[in-house]
Design a protein with these regions (language model features):
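Alpha-helix-loop-beta-strand connector modules within alpha/beta enzyme cores
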Residues: 118-132, 181-189, 292-298
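Hydrophobic faces of well-ordered beta-strands that scaffold small-molecule active sites
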Residues: 55, 103, 131-133, 154-156, ...
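Alpha-helix N-cap and loop-to-helix initiation/capping positions
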Residues: 83, 110, 170-178, 230, ...
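Glycine-rich S-adenosyl-L-methionine
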Residues: 173-191, 203
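Conserved Radical SAM active-site core
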Residues: 23, 27-149, 153-154, 162-163, ...
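Aromatic/hydrophobic pocket-lining residues that form the small-molecule binding cavity
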Residues: 88, 115, 144, 179, ...
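Conserved radical SAM core fold
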Residues: 75, 112, 137-140, 158-176, ...
């Protein structure tokens, strides 16, 4: 039984060996799947958002626990509600019935056995839309294999290939090695496939996408990289690897949205805040500036990837979520279908 893997948990490279039927692992979670919210999200890459929005399920807990995480309320502070496999399946179906283009599972690496069971039940109940796996790529291949045949779209991060940064920021010096292996596996198990879809309400589509038609992803891999301010050379390392190993096999998504998230002793203990601040000294904890963005644009031209998305530079922070609220994101970015603190 898949869930027996929780007894001596080695699902992720932390290999903490905890019996998660009895207590929490490094990820902060037990064997029970916990979810913060389910939304129609319109802020993902265009082929994932498509026209109806991505049916995004934000899971509680995380096996990486980055010091700069914008979702710290759910990734590190345990906010969420426990769901059974059938309840999880019903949430997937609810997102589909509300027009979601896919089911987008955010940060579920530590819940893979329970998620696999839930997805199997959802498909038996009639789930037809693609399933998207949205993760840090800090994952063991043995765990990912449980998702083979259940996931259609892989959306991993490649956060850094600098072991010093990964050690200092998320206490995982082996992250570069692990992420490369996981992403290679994802590319081997999914082929890029798109279909053209047209919006009946042309005005809404043109406003959001600039066109009444869009290419929707059916399967494949999109590899994300968040540029850290002051560490453009690290981004070049990542792009070098991606050019050599992923160009033409996956889409590349460069993100410029790094945003300082302020926390207080209401959120974390004094010791946790001190540890967090020490980790953040590895780079410049600020918004990206125009010079850095220009450098990124030059790198985009230099590497000339076959499939690449990038974010425009902005100082807007309205997109930062608050998972205490029924609508964690702005109304423009998402529509909540289910929330841990009550349905509406």
């Amino acid at each position: 039984m898949k869930n027996s893997l929780y007894e001596n948990c080695n699902l992720c490279p932390r290999n903490c060996g905890v019996n998660r039927f009895e207590k929490t692992g490094f990820c902060g979670e037990t064997s029970e799947i916990k979810i913060a919210c389910g939304t129609l999200h319109f802020g993902e890459e265009p082929p994932v958002t498509a026209l109806g929005g991505s049916g995004t399920i934000f899971l509680t807990g995380c096996n990486l626990r980055c010091a700069f995480c914008q979702n710290y309320q759910i990734s590190q502070k345990g906010m969420g509600k426990t769901l059974s496999a059938d309840e999880f399946a019903d949430l997937c179906l609810s997102l589909e019935s509300n027009g979601a283009e896919n089911v987008n599972l955010v940060t579920g690496s530590h819940h893979i056995p329970a998620i696999a069971e839930g997805l199997e039940r959802a498909k038996v109940k009639g789930l037809k839309i693609p399933v998207c796996w949205n993760s840090s790529a800090y994952e063991n291949i043995e765990a990912l294999e449980l998702l083979d045949g259940l996931v259609d779209i892989w959306l991993p991060d490649m956060k850094t290939l600098n072991p010093m940064i990964s050690d200092e920021v998320f206490k995982a010096k082996d992250y570069p090695k692990v992420a490369k292996k996981a992403i290679r596996w994802m590319m081997e198990h999914s082929t890029l496939k798109f279909e053209t879809v047209a919006e009946k309400n042309d005005k809404d589509s043109v406003k959001r996408h600039g066109s009444s038609q869009i290419e929707k992803m059916i399967s494949g891999v999109i590899i994300r990289h968040l540029v850290l301010p002051g560490r453009i050379d690290d981004t070049r390392l990542v792009l070098d690897w991606l050019k050599n190993h992923a160009d033409g096999k996956a889409c590349i998504s460069l993100m410029s949205q790094y945003t300082p998230v302020e926390v207080s002793e209401k959120d974390f203990s004094k010791e946790e805040i001190e540890s967090r601040e020490k980790s953040l000294q590895s780079f410049q904890h600020r918004l990206m500036n125009q010079n850095e963005f220009d450098e990124i644009r030059n790198l985009i031209d230099e590497y000339n990837f076959e499939y690449l998305f990038y974010q425009e530079l902005t100082s807007d922070t309205d997109w930062l979520p608050d998972f205490n609220k029924f609508q964690p994101f702005s109304n423009e970015l998402s529509k909540t279908i289910w929330h841990w603190n009550g349905e509406r």
